[in-house]
């Protein structure tokens, strides 16, 4: 007879031998029928921390709380037209490829610009692209890619463009009430388990619609029914704000726009946080710009007047020059980025970080002990 563990003894004491034996028999039968791990005690799971992949934006990683998009979950990105939804998704594609993963893009809108994707860092030669003829076909392709377990990220652009086959075959003007909602509901039921099992990140881009006759409250809604809202672990609301003017010869031109990304739903961290990013036309999210702003706000980059400094060395007069310096020095960019992530608890401390902290603490202890020795000497002299 196997030796009882402390946990087993506690369960036996609480529930009794007969009930525990019945439970063990049931668990063995379930494991036999459905495989190992079909049912387990939550504390026995080897991996309890949610794995994440960076979104490609430092500000968004901080807003998400966990440091990026959770693996094995469904993400919805929605917002008005030209707000930057596809740009945010393409940065996730580029980040996936940067980390050695495989990404797929289901282009239901038939509007993906390869040149723009390449400018954002996407390796278009390695990107899997599908332009389906119908919504069912697009979701089936996404399902097969996810089931393979070889794809790390699947992006569907967009839910509104996933037109059911019956609507395509019908005439314009025919009523097709609830067809798309039923299609999405069925797809979510089929895909959610496979997404979790394969640890694939599924990003669904969605558009906005307005409800008719709404006098009070928010009239905005997203097409495709409510299933995606329920199954999504993270929902991002992307809104373009003010235009960004250029400098020098381009001072009268709009070169980008400030964009607000609000985390309206988050199952892995506290929701309702906001990220403010600069989306530059033709370039995507300004990663150097957000790093300069965030690092200077928390004191990693020092700012005195118009000058920005790091580790006592001036890196530029004005934010534009500071951004250019970081773009020209990727090793400094990576070092500051790591320190910011450590500050917000998005990554674990490296050995170098721990050593630096330990050295500071040791110095403080030595200084304190010297002061104590001096105080004791003074006391002895007074007593003498």
Curated annotation (Swiss-Prot):
Q: Between which residues do disulfide bridges form?
A: none
May I have one GO cellular component term? cytosol
SMART domains for this protein: AAA
InterPro entries for this protein: AAA+_ATPase, DNA_recomb/repair_RecA, DNA_recomb/repair_RecA_CS, P-loop_NTPase, RecA-like_C, RecA-like_N, RecA_ATP-bd, RecA_C_sf
Q: Which GO terms describe its molecular function?
A: ATP binding; ATP hydrolysis activity; ATP-dependent DNA damage sensor activity; damaged DNA binding; single-stranded DNA binding
Q: Where in the cell is it found?
A: Cytoplasm
CDD domains recorded: RecA
Per the record, the domain of life is Bacteria
Known Pfam families for this protein? RecA (PF00154), RecA_C (PF21096)
Q: Which residues are ATP-binding?
A: 79-86
* Gene Ontology BP annotations: DNA recombination; DNA repair; SOS response
Could you tell me the keywords of this UniProt record? ATP-binding, Cytoplasm, DNA damage, DNA recombination, DNA repair, DNA-binding, Nucleotide-binding, SOS response
Q: What is its main location?
A: cytoplasm
Protein family membership: Belongs to the RecA family.
NCBIfam families referenced in this protein's UniProt entry, alphabetically:
tigrfam_recA
Report the protein's function. Can catalyze the hydrolysis of ATP in the presence of single-stranded DNA, the ATP-dependent uptake of single-stranded DNA by duplex DNA, and the ATP-dependent hybridization of homologous single-stranded DNAs. It interacts with LexA causing its activation and leading to its autocatalytic cleavage.
Under which name does UniProt file this protein? Protein RecA
Q: Which organism is it from?
A: Streptococcus thermophilus (strain CNRZ 1066)
């Amino acid at each position: 007879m196997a030796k009882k563990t402390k946990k087993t003894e506690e369960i036996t004491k609480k529930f009794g031998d007969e009930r525990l034996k019945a439970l063990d028999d049931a668990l063995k039968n379930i494991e036999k029928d459905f495989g190992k791990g079909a049912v387990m005690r939550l504390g026995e799971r080897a991996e309890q921390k949610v794995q994440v992949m960076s979104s490609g934006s430092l500000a968004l990683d901080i807003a998400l709380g966990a440091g990026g998009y959770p693996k094995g979950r469904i993400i919805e990105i929605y917002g008005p037209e030209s707000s930057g939804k596809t740009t945010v998704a393409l940065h996730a594609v580029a980040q996936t490829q940067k980390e050695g993963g495989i990404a797929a893009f289901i282009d239901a809108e038939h509007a993906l610009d390869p040149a723009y994707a390449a400018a954002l860092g996407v390796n278009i030669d390695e990107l899997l692209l599908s332009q389906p003829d119908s919504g069912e076909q697009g979701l089936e392709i996404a399902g097969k890619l996810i089931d393979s377990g070889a794809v790390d990220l699947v992006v569907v652009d967009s839910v509104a463009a996933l037109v059911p086959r019956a609507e395509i075959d019908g005439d314009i003007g025919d009523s097709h009430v609830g067809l798309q909602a039923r299609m999405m509901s069925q797809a979510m039921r089929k895909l959610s388990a496979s997404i979790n099992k394969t640890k694939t990140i599924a990003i669904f881009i969605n558009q906005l619609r307005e409800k008719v006759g709404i006098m009070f409250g928010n009239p905005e809604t997203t097409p495709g029914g409510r299933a995606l809202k329920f199954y999504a672990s993270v929902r991002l609301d992307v809104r373009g704000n003010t235009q960004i003017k250029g400098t020098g010869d381009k001072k009268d031109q709009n070169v980008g726009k400030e964009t607000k990304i609000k985390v309206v739903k988050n199952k892995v961290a506290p929701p309702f946080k906001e990220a403010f990013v600069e989306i530059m036309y033709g370039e995507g999210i300004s990663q150097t710009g957000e790093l300069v702003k965030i690092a200077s706000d928390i004191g990693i980059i020092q700012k005195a007047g118009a000058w920005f400094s790091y580790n006592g060395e001036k890196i530029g007069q004005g934010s534009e020059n500071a951004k250019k310096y970081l773009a020209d020095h990727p090793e400094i960019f990576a070092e500051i980025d790591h320190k910011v992530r450590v500050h917000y608890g998005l990554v674990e401390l490296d050995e170098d970080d721990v050593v630096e902290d330990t050295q500071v603490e040791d110095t403080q202890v030595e200084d304190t002990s010297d002061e104590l020795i001096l105080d004791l000497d003074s006391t002895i002299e007074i007593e003498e």
